[in-house]
Design a protein with these regions (language model features):
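Glycine-aromatic micro-motifs
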Residues: 1-118
Length: 120
């Protein structure tokens, strides 16, 4: 089974929730999403977190190792591809056990641009 690396922000930082949603996923480290900002955007059902490019800003994230089954569960939870799309990038990840930094290809869910920004 192929493993992929998912970067989490918002409610997917909650280990208990992620283990319920994605039982075989495991947290492997942390990273910083450079030149992105964290913000709320809305729909008819409420406000949700997303990330968007913003020069000079950074978003701290957790990094999960996921299987195809975990990714399918995340797709359903995040409303992919209707509500969120997936972006792939390469990031340096700090290992949670070793502290070693390794570059990894990761994926992240980003809300579609046509949804409304919530100002708070």
């Amino acid at each position: 089974m192929q493993k992929r690396y998912y970067i989490a922000y918002g409610s997917n930082l909650n280990i208990r929730q992620m283990k319920f949603r994605c039982p075989t996923a495991r947290i492997i480290g942390t990273a910083t999403l450079p030149d992105y900002e964290l913000l709320f955007k809305g729909s008819k059902t409420g406000s949700y977190l997303t990330v968007e490019p913003k020069k000079g800003k950074n978003v701290p994230v957790a990094v999960w190792e996921t299987t195809e089954t975990d990714e399918a569960a995340l797709d359903r939870y995040e409303g992919f591809p209707t509500f969120y799309y997936k972006a792939e990038m390469e990031l340096p990840i700090v290992g949670i056990r070793t502290g070693k930094v390794r570059k990894r290809k990761v994926y992240v869910y980003i809300m579609h641009e046509d949804l409304s920004l919530i100002h708070i």
